[in-house]
Amino acid sequence: MKTVIGIPAYNEGKNIASILLRLKNISEHIIVCDDGSSDLTSEIAEKLGAIVVTHTKNLGYGAAIKTIFLKAQEINADALVTFDADGQHRIEDIDKILVPIKNNKADIVIGSRFLNDKQKISKYRKIGIKTITELTKITS
């Protein structure tokens, strides 16, 4: 199964190298959508072997995700995992997310940090995350 990892990135020059180096162990097919960065995000990602698609100006998270989906389709991906460039997602969760797809039990899998009771997140932080998520949706 050709698994592609898609990373939307905006001014992630400080983070992108470490993320890409760790993700190379999971998939050799990594797409980085540089969403109008003014730093070296694209250059670093290219040097590390990622497929880089660049927006000339910042179009927002939604546009970056759409670009990643289109590129993944173009390169005939069987599965696409989106992954944040800032290191918030856990690389070790990728295999777990892919299991239902590999076993033909699901066409789409959505992960949530709120489903696991082991990870206690304060109400204050949950409200903050939900607020920022909604603001991002409105502005994208």
Regions inferred by a protein language model and the residue ranges of each:
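Cell-envelope/extracellular polymer assembly enzymes that use nucleotide-activated donors
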Residues: K2-V4
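Short, well-formed alpha-helical segments that are part of the catalytic scaffolds
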Residues: G6-I26
